[in-house]
Amino acid sequence: MEPGVSIESGSAIRVAVLPVGGPISPARLRDYAALVARHARVDLASLRPYYSEHQKSPFAHQPWGGGCLRLKFVLGGCVPSPWEDFQSSRKVLAVVGICHLPSSPDLGRVAADFVDAARSYPSALASRCFAFCPTDAQLVQKKRDNIIMFPPSDQQSLELHMLTMIQDLSASLLMEFEKWVLRAESTGTILKTPLDSQSSLGSEEVIKAKKRRLGRAQKIIGDYCLLAGSPADANAHYATAIELARLTGDVFWHAGALEGSVCALVVDRMAESDPVLEDEVKFRYYTIIQLYRRATLQDNAQRVSPVSFELEAALKLARYLCRRQCAKEVSDLLMGAADGAKALIDASDRLILYIEIARLFGTLGYKRKAAFFSRQVAQLYLQQDNAYAAMSAMQVLTTTTTAYHVQSRKTSKMDHGLLKSVVSLFESQWSTLQMVVLREILMSSIRAADPLSSWSAAARLLRSFYPLITPAGQSGLASSLSNSADKLPSGTRCADPCLPFIRLHSFPLHPSQREIVKRNPNKKEWWTGGGPSGPFIYTPFTKGGTSGTSKQEVNWIVGEPVQVMVELANPCSFDLIVESIYLSVHSGNFDAFPVSVNLPPNTSKLVLLSGIPTQVGQVSIPGCIVHCFGVITEHLFKEVDCLLLGAAQGLVLSDPFRCCGSSKFKSVNFPSISVVPPLPLLVANVVGGDGSILLYEGEIRDVLITLTNAGTVPVEEANVALSGKNQDSVISIAHSTWKSALPIKPGGEVTFAVTLRAWHLSPTDLEADGSRSPANSRRIAREGSNPFLDIHYAGPSGNSESNDVSLPPGRRLVVPLNICVVQGMRLVRARLLSMELPARFTDAHLRSVSSKDNLSNGSDAIRNDISLLKIDPYKGSWDLRLLELELFNPTDVVFDVDVSVHLDGTSVEQKILPEDKTASSACHKTRIDRDYSARVLIPLEHFKLPVLDTSFFVKENGSDEPLGSRAATLAEKNAKAELNASINNLISKIKVKWHSGRNSSGELNIKDAIQTALQASIMDILLPDPLTFSFRHAKDGTTAKTDSSKEPGDGSSRSADESVLRCKDPIFANEMTHMEVQIRNNTKETIRMNLSISCKDVAGENCFDENSATVLWAGVLSDIYLEVQPLQEVVHPFSIYFLVPGDYSLQAASVIIDATDVLRARAKAESPDEPILCRGSPFHIHVVGTA
């Protein structure tokens, strides 16, 4: 069998092209051969100048106008075929020698070599030797026969010269064909095939051979007519041969003649596309196949079988019909030919058959069938034990890799912008077959001594099918990779990656890369309005943007290092040593830094790959360059993304990252990376350390911040602003300091101060700590609660003369002020106390307290201080309410606590009553050591409202009230607002401040605690009594003068102030003492009442008892009817006479007649008939005896 056969093959003249003379390089030989083969078709009309008709031509229907000769050049020649007499197209009818004269200076030797080479082809009818590039000396030598020199010239001249010589050769062949045909017609010829020479012929076979000789001669004459370009003459001879072969029963030659007639028919109508012609060709060729099959059955006893001609006929018809419309018919023909391969004795015939079947299936588009028969070809090549056969097997197997989707990357240029279908790239059901193909490529490449191909095959096998390979097999492939790499030069690159698997993990941008701000040339304050509210401008791996198609943008700066995080996985059972890995950048404006990585078996690792942008422009990073197993390969991120997507859909064998314990596949969008010109780079440093700034609540401190320009461009402009939470904790920023330092040159720095004040912690921060352990409760710092310094800065604006209005971008530096607010003093609890027992204070105590702060104010100041104390050393604190605050110091420092109450715009410091009552005198400050507590008492008597109003008792739910006057409703609302304002005023007047060390001070937030403590008793504290009683001592019947600075309506203040009897005004026994009781109406309505005055001794006995009276009196002391106008006072005088010295107390009480609802609500009466009794505080009197 012969390769590349077709129906038209019978019309091609076989010409052997042989190199002769000295050695010729393969490249030069290919160039010379291509120059010859370019003229494979020679028109008959062009042969007229070289053709001479010696006698009448046997080709009566020669188409000189449109016919042509077809030449088939065979480089290197071919072995003579035993079937040359059966098909003349198998003969080598011409020999062309190619000589490179610079390597063959002796023309005689060249001529001799050519004669010797041409002698190997006795069937050759013409010969020429083309000698190229002769020297001047060779050109002047005597010309030799059949040696044609081609002087050096341009390509066009060489082609024209060659065309002339090929035309001359073709004309010689045509004249030789005429001679051969004329001789064969006159004298006949003896034609033999291997079928005729197998055994000695008997008498019957001799007679049969003589009958068949004429028909065979007509068939051969038809072949020569076809070779001479006269299909009409050939068809006439073929028709005669067909009839004679049919009559003589020469089945084999009958099939040959019929096949020649089809060739003549097709060649004659080459330019036509006729369905009738196609049907005729198919009908005749099916007949030819049947005839060859009959001839095979007749000659099955012969050692040489003509089955190859049957298979060739099937291949010729399949090639003629090879198109999509006839796919089924062509496939049936090819599969039938494949079945007949078993009958072929010669292995080379089977090889050619499988090659042709694979080619035709590939032309038809049946890639898988073509790959299957290509593998059969490779198997036949591998049966031969030589390197050339192994190379052929490797090349054939390489053609099948596309069909099995295991092709090398170098054979398929991938488009990095478009992802191929996962289904077409990965088909797990082919895994076993794909492994077999790659293993065959690996074996053939090793036998062919091609280390790069063997490395590529082993890499694809290990990378794609590691889950199906045993650990021993994986180690064997690793050894094969290392052995192949040892035979390759250092730095060899391969298009097919091996291990590890690499996927893009993230872009961990440095803050200097995140904070890039575009500058608007039309806006002076370019930093306003364009930035986000938080400290981060760009977060690469979050779902951002309202448009799903918008691509994220990342700006890199020339000369500043950047990082890309990738994840490496080694799913195999051996240690993987990656000699170097770095980013693959195709844009050429990036310098990548290599790193080495060691991956243990079945592990993955995150690796940071870095580099420096070198030029302005776009940066493209499709993957990584890896130097592993001695070869450099490129690993593309998108290939691994396709692999992981296929694993997620179950289309590929395994996910290498999940096998190594990595997280689930997460697709990472590759951002658009732009490189901008060099920018300044400010680095902030908080003097004293970058940790948290520890501040107690309310503490004020200056923090120094240093800015250093670490870039290569000066800072021309800058702006410092505040962002984040608790911005009011920044009191001031020294703007003038850093502004005066502009411009900040590269390497320069500036230091400025920021004044901070710690804020008060929220209730959520002050959760109760049952253990009270300082380690558990002292440090409270919440993320996101700190303020930030937003520093926008930029370098020079560039060339002002340039027409480009765009400015280099600016930068944003975020300096977090990590303030850790610590609770300096803890308010454990607050509660309201009612003091109903006398609080005894010595006279010296009162004098020491009053003189400590107000020594220069005289006696009036002393009286004011005593009144503010709200405690009578003699009569106690009958109606006094004390607010107790329990404080705890959980820190490791000492605190001094001050309590102050602000009255009428002045701050009056309150004295602290420590829990230890043994103190001899009160102190302004209370010192609380570590892990100690103290209690602070705050009197609340001076906070009562001046008037008891009806509106204070209006129900909050007004739905029950009828629609009344809008003015009344407004008054009620105003009264409620006044009550709420009074409550808030009461709370705001109490201040608890602390001091610690030299500069640390603050204020304790007690508002909520006080409000909770006063929740139940706020009405009793704020609202005054309906009636206020006070006693006066009158000398000689006249009332003692009081402090004229008192307000007339401030009854509570007057009673409190004047109820204290001074030691300088003693009362003596056995003397008449004149007294007055003052009653004040604190309501807006007239009150009628019955007043009674009682006197008791220290035993609580009534001193006015008629039976055992110890005190005598003058005046009315019981059932005294009085009527007091709204907000007015009445005075009732009386006199008393003490018989026995001692301590006595006077007390006034009144029963209100016809009490109103307001009075009943204030008294919290349970029934409307219940009497309303108002009682005043006891008035203590100390009576001394007479000397």
Curated annotation (Swiss-Prot):
<dbReference type="GO" id="GO:0000919">
    <property type="term" value="P:cell plate assembly"/>
</dbReference>
<feature type="region of interest" description="Disordered">
    <location>
        <begin position="1037"/>
        <end position="1059"/>
    </location>
</feature>
<dbReference type="InterPro" id="IPR013935">
    <property type="entry name" value="TRAPP_II_complex_Trs120"/>
</dbReference>
<dbReference type="GO" id="GO:0005802">
    <property type="term" value="C:trans-Golgi network"/>
</dbReference>
<comment type="subunit">
    <text>Part of the multisubunit TRAPP (transport protein particle) II complex composed of BET3, BET5, TRS20, TRS23, TRS31, TRS33, TRS65, TRS85, TRS120 and TRS130.</text>
</comment>
<keyword id="KW-0813">Transport</keyword>
<dbReference type="Pfam" id="PF08626">
    <property type="entry name" value="TRAPPC9-Trs120"/>
</dbReference>
<keyword id="KW-0333">Golgi apparatus</keyword>
<keyword id="KW-0967">Endosome</keyword>
<protein>
    <recommendedName>
        <fullName>Trafficking protein particle complex II-specific subunit 120 homolog</fullName>
    </recommendedName>
</protein>
<comment type="similarity">
    <text>Belongs to the TRS120 family.</text>
</comment>
<comment type="function">
    <text>Specific subunit of the TRAPP II complex, a highly conserved vesicle tethering complex that is required for the proper transport of proteins in post-Golgi trafficking pathways to the growing cell plate in mitotic active cells.</text>
</comment>
<dbReference type="GO" id="GO:0005769">
    <property type="term" value="C:early endosome"/>
</dbReference>
